[in-house]
C-alpha cells in the first residue's frame, strides 16, 4: 500500500529540475530562494523534500532576513529541522553577512556627508534596516579618506546600545586610521537622531581628536532612510 504523504526524493527528480544541477547549469542568480536554501539543507524526509522544507522555513520566518534573525532554538522547533540542518542554515547566512561587511569600494573616497550616506546605503542598509537591535559600527579611513575596514563595536537592545570609546580608539590605533565615520541603526525605522545620539557623537569626536583622528560623520540607518549628523550640522 502506498503512502499518500510520500514525496519523491530530489535525487529522483528530472535532472533539469534538481536545485544543485540548476545552479551548476544556470548559475545561482537564476534560482528562487527555496531552491538555494534546499541546497544548503541537502535532504528532506519521507514527508517532504528539501525544497519543501526550505519553502516552509522561508514562509515561517518571512524570508532570509527573518531566517537570519531566528535563533537556533527557534529553528529546532520546526518539524524536520535537526541540529545539523540548523547549523548549516545559520552558517550559510552568517557567511553572507560577513561578505557584505568585508566588501569595500575600490578607491572610494568619502569627503562629504553625501559620500558617507551613499556608503552606508550600499553596505549597511540591507544588513541593518530590519535588525531588531541597535548595532554600532565604525568605518575607518586612511589619510585620503578611503575605507580601510568597518568594524562592529557593539550590539544593544531595541532602543539603545552602549559604546566604549576605548574600543573605538583601539581600532583606530590598530589600523592607523586618520579619520572615521560612525554608523548605527534605529530598529524603529525612524533615523531621526536622539539627544543621546548627538551627545555620544560629540564625546567620541573629542576622544578621537586626542589620538589625531577626525570623526567626519555619524550616519543613522532607518527603514530605507539615512540621516547624516554632519549634514544636519549636529557634530
Swiss-Prot record:
Residue positions of motif JAMM motif: 184-197
Domain MPN, chain residue ranges per copy: 109-235
CDD domains the record matches: MPN_DUF2466 (cd08071)
One of the GO BP terms on file: proteolysis
Keyword annotations of the record: Hydrolase, Metal-binding, Metalloprotease, Protease, Zinc
UniProt cross-references to PANTHER family, sorted A to Z: DNA REPAIR PROTEIN RADC, UPF0758 PROTEIN YEES-RELATED
Family the UniProt entry places it in: Belongs to the UPF0758 family.
Protein name, per record: UPF0758 protein COPRO5265_1522
Source species of the chain: Coprothermobacter proteolyticus (strain ATCC 35245 / DSM 5265 / OCM 4 / BT)
